[in-house]
Amino acid sequence: GEPRHCLATNGTAAWQAEMTELLASSPFGKQAKVWPGKDLWALRSLLFTEPVDLLIGNSYGKYLERDTGTPLIRLMFPIFDRHHHHRFPLMGYQGGLRLLTTILDTIFDRLDRETMQTAVTDYSYDLTR
């Protein structure tokens, strides 16, 4: 998936221009919309009107996950509702591995939840990941 919404409560017009340029420079970011000065309530509305597959954010995103059913990947500061997540790297090689692992684990968790019906949706991926 490509990014769809990039939102920052303290985002300025300069930030919006910079992010728009950055996203437009990649074929994967051309569809993204940049939203400066918007809060979680605005993001909640966006998730209902223009749904996405995954949400990357902090602990406050858990309420959006509950309301919209969009799986949350906790990567940003602050993370209050998970133990020792502040110690995990976000930058460099180790951070990249952690990001990849976290995203894949979230996708696998969702796949497991959505494929529980015996002989209907129970694909045999359980032990081959």
Regions found by a protein language model. Give the residues of each.
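An N-terminal assembly and electron-transfer interface module characteristic of large anaerobic redox
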Residues: G1-R129
